[in-house]
Amino acid sequence: MRAIGILVILTIIISANGSRSAGIEMNVTLAAASPNRASQQGELAIIINKSNPNDNISLAELKQYFLAERSNWSPGGAKVRVVMREPGRPEREAVLNLIYRMNEKGFTSYFLAKKFTGELVDGPRQQNSTPDVIKFISYVPGAIGYVRADEVDASVKVLRVGGLAPGEPGYMIKL
């Protein structure tokens, strides 16, 4: 995180005889972070298992994977396992709006209907924390999910969407 701040405190003391004395106390904090990291705040990264050979997919393909319209990765062939955050999280709301193009009720109805008709055995897996999402994806070869871009670690791979990664101009998966 980028933190640049300067705190200046001016102290003026007036004594009983009317003479004045002044003092200045300065506290300077400078910390730098990569500009790309700072620009990722508020963006979501689509993450996959490191063994997945894919590096880039279109938004339409991403939607097909998330909607369980494609059950296996191409190329690679691993079974797709979508991981979602729990209802009410801003990350989940953003994904429902931007990728699924539905609200929570529509999402629930969609997957219940797929299960009822036998098209799908189970829907997206739910995880209650970012570390849990990352851990699941790092262990399951076909897993795909999302986390805040500034919380990604080296145990997973960030998937480019439409040729763009978080922090690049035009990247559209944001909170």
Residue ranges, per PLM feature:
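Signal peptide cleavage region of secreted peptide precursors
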Residues: S19-S21
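Bacterial N-terminal signal peptides
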Residues: I6-S15
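Exported/periplasmic ABC-transporter solute-binding proteins
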Residues: I24-L175
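Positively charged n-region of N-terminal signal peptides that target proteins for export
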Residues: M1-I4
